[in-house]
Amino acid sequence: MKWLRYLLGEGLLYRLYRRRILKEIEGLAKPQHVAMILDGNRRWAKLRALESSAHGHRAGADKIHEFLSWCEEQGIEVVTLYLLSSDNLGARESAELDDLAIIIENLADQLSRFSNWRVKHVGSTKELPQHLRDTLAGAAERTSKNSGLHINLAVGYGGREEIT
């Protein structure tokens, strides 16, 4: 079973696929800004019969660094990660939101201490727990002078509040 994980994970098939993709996009115009909505982590955890959706959210967060490194390698200047919408802040159970806040805090802190990346929070802070607000502000402050990949962490974002 270990060999199957090797082939399907970071192993042979992954490396072949990655090489093929990189060859196909070589020389093509690349976007300056990539945005990603991180969705499906709860479904992923449920399909694997994991005891809580937090396992899915953590697994998703664990892949973000790899994704951002790939974006940086490709010369993409700005990445926006849509992590938690204002709609979901009102719709999720408090236990799940507590887990998400901790996961987002850990992510923001880790990203702000890696390389020369610049981390910025976008979205409203009014519904966020104070500890998450503090972590997002600290990450932005710590990286404000960095000149590398610009990462927008969209937490508490949504367009409904802006409709008048």
Where are these regions (language model features)?
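Flexible, compositionally biased loop and terminal segments
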Residues: 1-164
